[in-house]
Amino acid sequence: MLKLRDWGYQDIHELRDVVPSKRCSCYYADFLAERGRLGVYQDYTRLWWTGAFRGAQPWEDPPSPLPTDEHIDVYCASQAASWIRDDPGGRPFYLQVCFTGPHTPFDAPPDFRSLYKPEEVPLPILAAPDNPVSPQVAQMLKSARLDGMTETHARMMVSHYYAKVTLIDHGVGMVLDALADKGILDDTWVIYTSDHGEMLGDHRLKQKKVFYEGAARIPLIVRPPGGTSARRTKQLTDHVDICASLTEAAGAGAVGESMGRSFVTGTEVVDDDSGKRYVWSEVESYYSMARDDRYKMTVDSASRRPVELYDMLEDPCELANLVFESGHRTVRDRFLEEAFPALGFDAAKLDAFKRRLARGQYRDTFARDLLRRFN
């Protein structure tokens, strides 16, 4: 089995997601144990997990019982800042700081929660998906159990999430301060992004595993060495472009065959609004999505059968699924012919995925239902 060091990582400080336990400890668990706080945190996470399994919703998440400087996300930032300050310098470095938040639980400490009043935050898109509903979305609606969510519930959930995001922002600031204190901030590329978004009540959904904007559209903030004048771009980009950009910034060659397109030249961000024609996203090997500057289409990964089509120009809230509309046949055909072949999905990959499912590595309801469907 390949380990992180086999991929070139030299200094590894691995965390156990948000819930270190007696069976799966980590550096953060040791940190809390040294302060006599591990039991407090484990009691909290046990309470949260029990509630989640019994149907508790994110607006019910209690705040962290730990002070801010002992929260796992601040601990993560503190470790990164210490690494920066202790680094002897004189050599380039790549530092990847992976916060566990703002993933559930939405457990920001009380001082961060106090920054947001539920009655002042915006409401999510409360309209549930209308027919036709894709099998993927139907399953996640069933899993989310938000059909009884009120506006009060929604605002509470959003305010808790905003507080958690602000906690992450605090951690990012700690890392940037360390770079500045070291005198290398203006010599460093800083890229802020995420692996996925959060539905946060939009369409009566939560978390991820769908391709609505709440889950698929994520932040990307790039600061080149020395900074630059602030600007926004609407060009399409995705994670493979970040990889291509980092290797170009480092003066390295391309990483094999890649769909990535660099958005940097030298130490500058390219001022180019042309972007890519298509970007993609996938939920394992269940469903695949492609998007251009106007349309977003989802297909069943195995059969390539279209299940969702949205006109993002006319319907930015994604309320009307046009997948069966005869007037959009040419759009569907274009995506099937131009966009999805690039993903290279085939029967062999599907068979490999089915074998992984059968070994029990995917145990959530969504995966079990799909395994039954595949068989």
Each model region followed by its residue ranges:
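Long, internal low-complexity/basic segments
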Residues: 146-156, 164, 324-375
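Histidine-centered active-site microenvironments of extracellular/periplasmic hydrolases
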Residues: 105-111, 177-228, 238
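Active-site rim elements
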Residues: 63-71, 151-163, 207, 227-237, ...
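Active-site His/acidic residue clusters
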Residues: 82-127, 142-156, 199
